[in-house]
């Protein structure tokens, strides 16, 4: 293991357009090949589609969607005496948010639709209504943790 100091965690600055740290994190997750302006346009278009369809504030709906997709527990593999157990562990808030954003982007890309902004808008609206693939993934993660509760004492 490295003896050097741990890297300092840089603070995430809020996105200038939406004044939201979550939006800034989402842009980073959407970005491919360093094309940040394209990712910003995708998020901006998705937010305008959401506002158009719901008539509400898109940023608030986005924050609700992320909250609904954020897992509270996860299972991690732990090897004990030749056997590998799925050990349920609590998820730190930062990691939970990162997982939710990653799932939202992944399942948006897998959706049927014309443009990425339309697919992202659809996934965000579904997640805000507690439906959609990202929320299903969270529920599956929670079910796995519940099923493996017996191995919780192997926590590290």
Curated annotation (Swiss-Prot):
Gene3D superfamilies on file: Ribosomal protein S7 domain (1.10.455.10)
Family: Belongs to the universal ribosomal protein uS7 family.
PANTHER family from the UniProt entry: RIBOSOMAL PROTEIN S7
Any single GO CC term annotated in Swiss-Prot or TrEMBL for this entry: small ribosomal subunit
A GO biological-process term: translation
Complexes and interactors: Part of the 30S ribosomal subunit. Contacts proteins S9 and S11.
InterPro entries listed in its UniProt record: Ribosomal_uS7, Ribosomal_uS7_bac/org-type, Ribosomal_uS7_CS, Ribosomal_uS7_dom, Ribosomal_uS7_dom_sf
Domain of life: Bacteria
Protein name: Small ribosomal subunit protein uS7
Pfam families: Ribosomal_S7 (PF00177)
Species this chain originates from: Prochlorococcus marinus (strain MIT 9515)
NCBIfam families listed in its UniProt record: rpsG_bact
Keyword field: Ribonucleoprotein, Ribosomal protein, RNA-binding, rRNA-binding, tRNA-binding
Known role: One of the primary rRNA binding proteins, it binds directly to 16S rRNA where it nucleates assembly of the head domain of the 30S subunit. Is located at the subunit interface close to the decoding center, probably blocks exit of the E-site tRNA.
GO MF, any single term: tRNA binding
């Amino acid at each position: 293991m490295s003896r050097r100091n741990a890297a300092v965690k840089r603070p995430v600055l809020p996105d200038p357009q939406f004044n939201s740290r979550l939006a800034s994190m989402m842009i980073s997750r959407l970005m491919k090949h360093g094309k940040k302006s394209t990712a910003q346009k995708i998020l901006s278009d998705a937010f305008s589609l959401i506002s158009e369809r719901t008539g509400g504030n898109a940023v608030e709906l986005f924050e609700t969607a992320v909250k609904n997709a954020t897992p509270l527990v996860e299972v991690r593999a732990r090897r004990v005496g030749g056997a590998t157990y799925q050990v349920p562990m609590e998820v730190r808030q930062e990691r939970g948010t990162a997982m939710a954003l990653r799932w939202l982007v992944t399942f948006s890309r897998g959706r049927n639709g014309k443009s990425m902004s339309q697919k992202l808008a659809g996934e965000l609206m579904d997640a805000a209504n507690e439906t959609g693939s990202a929320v299903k993934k969270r529920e599956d993660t929670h079910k796995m943790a519940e099923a493996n509760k017996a191995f919780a004492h192997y926590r590290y």
